[in-house]
Amino acid sequence: MKKFLQLALVAILFASCSKQNDLIEPAIDPVGANQLFFQDINLAVYSIKASSSNSTGVKIDFSTLYEKNITKLELMSGETPNYLCAIHTENLSANSTQLKSYQVIEANPKASTMYYMIRYSLKNGDWGYTNVLKFQRGN
């Protein structure tokens, strides 16, 4: 039984979905200064924006100012901010210190209100998450 529980725990840890306990609303700078959506020592997300791409799809544009020691970026999506699954993966091979832009289209979102987040994996095996972006269709 102990071995089964260990295997189950490993399977959960390596799944492409992630449970978030908190929704963090990004701070909005009212005076328009250069405030980042997310920043830590490994990643700086300059902006992330979701918009309607057609009658059903959602286009997510995001840009990074730097990427350090990161092997993989994953855009995650979900109907709630607490349970998100990977919808797009970018495998990275080198550090970046210049603005990089990414664009992903989620052709069939599950709900009219969707939540998006970037998860990243580091070379040492650690990982991190950005803040969560809420998108409401029709707004």
Model-inferred region functions:
Residues F14-S16:
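C-terminal motif of bacterial Sec signal peptides marking the signal peptidase cleavage site
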Residues K2-V10:
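Sec-dependent signal peptide recognition
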Residues E106-D126:
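Beta-strand-rich modules
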Residues L23-K68, N131-N139:
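Pro/Thr/Ser/Gly-rich low-complexity, intrinsically disordered linker/stalk tracts
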Residues E67, T80, K123-G125:
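Short coil/turn motifs at secondary-structure junctions
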Residues K72-A111:
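Recognizes extended acidic, P/S/T-rich segments that occur
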Residues S18-Q20:
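Bacterial signal peptide processing site
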